[in-house]
Regions:
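Membrane-helix interface/capping residues of multi-pass secondary transporters
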Residues: 32, 62-63, 174-175, 300, ...
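Juxtamembrane intracellular "pre-TM" segments in multi-pass secondary transporters
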Residues: 1, 199-274, 295, 394-403, ...
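Short amphipathic helix-loop junctions that connect adjacent transmembrane helices
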Residues: 18-33, 134-135, 284-303
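Primarily residues marking transmembrane-helix entry/exit sites
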Residues: 2-3, 32, 103-111, 248-256, ...
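Multi-pass alpha-helical transporter architecture, strongest
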Residues: 83-84, 185-201, 345-355, 483-523
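Substrate-agnostic recognition of the 12-TM MFS/MFS-like secondary transporter fold
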Residues: 1-20, 38-76, 102-171, 182-198, ...
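Transmembrane alpha-helix termini and helix-breaking/packing motifs in multi-pass membrane transporters
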Residues: 21-28, 81, 85-94, 160-186, ...
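C-terminal ends and interior cores of transmembrane alpha-helices
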Residues: 71-103, 339-370, 382, 388-406
Length: 523
């Protein structure tokens, strides 16, 4: 039931994130401005509120957190879909009211509701995938690894199929029908997920037992030197989590500070930071890389095929994770995954200097070449007037003649590296995810994972800033090299964590009996 609930939630999220981007483009005259604003608002809100969301997850019963997050998320998407339907149906009439300011109000409402839905989705992800499944597996590391891998496989499949499904509806019908489809899906999904999560909560009694968050004056601060990897030591006689700020007028500021401090003092801090650094990259199947591929003559159908292959390699990474963890242990699995990831990315570095690469350093220093300004350059993200949507695929119309690359070796090496690297990437991601689950005090899981989400969004913002600073295809090689440097830094942080972790005696998760005794002490 937890898998079905997770699949429905992920499917709805993937459909919505794809559709809202297309809707905003269509609403603003096929311009990327609204989409860019939406992206910044979403990233900024999670960055600022991640710790608060996590703290809210920690302080409230598990069933109330899951139900509230689910309701807020689906209701926000439903209302937003209704607003979008009205805007699409009566756009000309709305634009004529208040000299067009009603249109601005509608755009603002859409972006705010979509952002609220994303925040609720973040809370639900932290609650279910970072806390619930740990308890459901009975604190069994093998079962936890299998459950994490299965959830990630579901995520990989929905990442491909969900946008394709809603894209077909929008293409064959209309944007209004697409909004209606998403609206209906969310209402049905809300009911099913609510029932399934409630049933899981009743079936697993341990979910109803949750240690309270220590307040100032109720728990002594735990010194970093006294922290160990095992949950037994952490929850033993001196295993209470550090105190957190109580509610009050300065609750938000104190919670954010306490959340970041809690994140910093975790034993797995370097591993979490290493994972966050992997978000600063253009080496993925996002709008940046696909835009670059189009400028290099890659057709939309071929790109869709490559995305499908990348999903398969991602699934291979989840399978490899479970086998490596069983054979070599969790920490060593991260080391092997890191090495595999970096080795595959060397192909991307080679693509920068291979035949067919458009990299031209003179564009960064035009004063060295008087003719640099006369060089024809294309932005990584083309104007939407030159493209159209067809079955979730963007196809170029009327590509300038003579702009085809001399050789496709560079682009082949690039995508070969990106696709194969996903095996190590997803195995590493699962490794760090489980390390966070195993090594974070139960009453701090929410706030620490909330800060981790904030870090991920922060590093993701940096890669967009990189593209804004160097937006031409001729700059893409520089972005590739910078991305590999960030990824290398992230894996280096993990290597430092692994070295430190291996010097400590391995901690054991408590048995059900010890777990119950510990919770009795906390309560």
């Amino acid at each position: 039931m937890i898998y079905v609930s997770g699949a429905l939630s992920m499917w709805g999220d993937r459909m919505w994130h794809f559709a809202i981007s297309v809707f905003l483009i269509e609403l603003y005259g096929r311009n990327l401005l609204l989409t860019a604003i939406f992206g910044l608002v979403v990233a900024g809100s999670v960055l600022l509120l991640g710790a608060l969301i996590g703290d809210w997850v920690d302080r409230n019963p598990r069933n109330k957190v899951a139900h509230a997050s689910l309701l807020v998320q689906n209701i926000s998407v439903t209302v937003c879909s209704i607003v979008l339907m009205l805007v699409f149906l009566y756009k000309q009439w709305i634009e004529s009211i208040w000299d067009g300011w009603l249109t601005v109000v509608c755009y603002t409402v859409v972006i705010v509701l979509a952002d609220v839905a994303n925040l609720a989705s973040t809370a639900l992800t932290i609650a279910i995938q970072r806390d619930w499944i740990v308890v459901i597996t009975g604190y069994n590391r093998g079962h936890l690894a299998g459950m994490n891998a299965t959830m990630r496989r579901i995520d990989q499949v929905t990442n491909i199929l969900a946008p394709l499904a809603v894209g077909q509806v929008m293409t064959l019908a209309s944007n209004v029908i697409g909004c209606g489809f998403i609206l209906g899906w969310n209402l049905v999904s809300l009911i099913v997920e609510f029932i399934f999560l409630s049933r899981v909560y009743r079936i697993v009694p341990a979910l109803s037992v949750k240690p309270p968050v220590p307040e100032d004056g109720q728990a002594s601060l735990e010194r970093p030197a006294e922290r160990t990897e095992g949950l037994v030591e952490r929850r033993g006689s001196q295993g209470q989590c550090p105190a957190r700020a109580p509610g009050g007028c300065c609750y938000g500021d104190l919670t954010c500070k306490d959340g970041w401090r809690a994140y910093y003092r975790q034993d797995v801090f370097l591993a979490g930071m290493g994972l966050a650094f992997l978000y600063t990259t253009v080496l993925g199947f996002d709008c940046i890389t696909t835009g670059y591929a189009y400028t290099q003559g890659i057709s939309g159908s071929l790109l869709s095929l490559l995305m499908g292959v990348s999903a398969i390699t991602g699934l291979m990474g989840t399978v490899m994770f479970t086998k490596l963890r069983k054979a070599y242990g969790l920490v060593n699995t991260g080391i092997i995954s890191s090495c595999l990831h970096l080795c595959c990315l060397l192909l991307c570095v080679c693509s920068v200097f291979a035949p067919g690469s458009p990299m031209d350093l003179r564009l960064l220093m035009p004063f060295l070449d008087a003719n640099a300004n006369s060089t024809l350059v294309e932005p990584l993200l083309p104007d939407r007037s030159s493209i159209h949507w067809t079955n979730n695929t963007v196809l170029f119309e009327n590509m300038p003649s003579g702009m085809e690359p001399d050789s496709y070796i560079s682009i082949i090496l690039l995508f070969l590296g990106v696709i194969t690297a996903r095996i190590g990437l997803w195995s590493f991601d699962l490794t760090v995810t489980q390390l966070l689950q195993e090594n974070i005090c139960e009453s701090e899981r929410g706030v620490v994972n909330g800060v981790q989400s904030s870090m991920n969004y922060l590093m993701d913002l940096l890669h967009f800033i990189m593209v804004i600073s160097a937006p031409q295809p001729q700059h893409f090689g520089i972005l590739v090299i910078i991305s590999v440097l960030f990824i290398t830094t992230g894996h280096t942080m993990y290597f430092l964590y692994a070295r430190k972790a291996k010097r400590k005696p391995a901690g054991l998760w408590p048995s059900a009996k010890v777990q119950e005794q510990t919770r009795t002490q906390v309560n």
